[in-house]
Swiss-Prot record:
One of its GO terms (biological process) is photosynthesis. SUPFAM superfamilies: Cytochrome c. Heme c binds at residues 14, 17-18, 58. Its main location: other. This is Cytochrome c6. Pfam families: Cytochrome_CBB3 (PF13442). Belongs to the cytochrome c family. PetJ subfamily. InterPro entries: Cyt_c-like_dom, Cyt_c-like_dom_sf, Cyt_C6, Cyt_C_IC. It comes from Anabaena variabilis. The keyword Thylakoid applies.
């Protein structure tokens, strides 16, 4: 997965709620590594599934993003989580 594309896709589609790894919808479920691990979402597959299908306040991106774009943004989120969103 291409992290440059992942960053662009994140900026265009995710940053309005998840800038800096935060979560404006459900504050305790951030995109930080510890929270992703706590909620069983610290994998490209889990992040990709949530982006694809949505959950609770998060909309589904299935019709808006191609599968390869979802894979790129999931890889980007994992990389940023690993780096503590710095």
């Amino acid at each position: 997965a291409d992290s440059v594309n992942g960053a662009k896709i994140f900026s265009a589609n995710c940053a309005s709620c998840h800038a800096g790894g935060k979560n404006l919808g459900v504050a305790q479920k951030t995109l930080k590594k510890a929270d992703l691990e706590k909620y069983g979402a610290y994998s490209a597959m889990a992040i990709g599934a949530q982006v694809t299908n949505g959950k609770n306040a998060m909309p589904a991106f299935k019709g808006r993003l191609k599968p390869e774009e979802i894979x790129x943004v999931a890889a980007y989120v994992l990389g940023k989580a690993e780096a503590e969103w710095k």
